[in-house]
């Protein structure tokens, strides 16, 4: 994985597209709130913002909330968003971005939903942005 990341950075430098303006949306998804910020490749990020999680709502409301948060953070990005990192509680299929939470009284409504495609469908401006799902600690 590290090799591919280095290869990608090198390509961006070679083709003149540069990564200096490329931004990443960072989300820490909790049951009560979602913390979010925007970062550049050097780790310089905006102030962390807090949003209500709506973890006990319907599928549509949860997905619309994720999309709304991404849109708000995109406005803070001075450049294009090339990636979205989501730290999210388990059980969760982190490789495929699919929630496996059931019976936890949070995010039950998004069980089995592929989050990347659902969020991109609601926020087409994310285009080819890559998603990375990580276990929250």
PLM feature segments, named:
Residues 32, 89-92:
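Short glycine-rich anion-binding loops that position phosphate/pyrophosphate groups of nucleotides
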Residues 24-28, 81-85, 132:
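Short glycine-aspartate micro-motif
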Residues 55, 63-64, 92-137:
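Glycine-rich phosphate-binding loop and adjoining helix at the ATP-binding site
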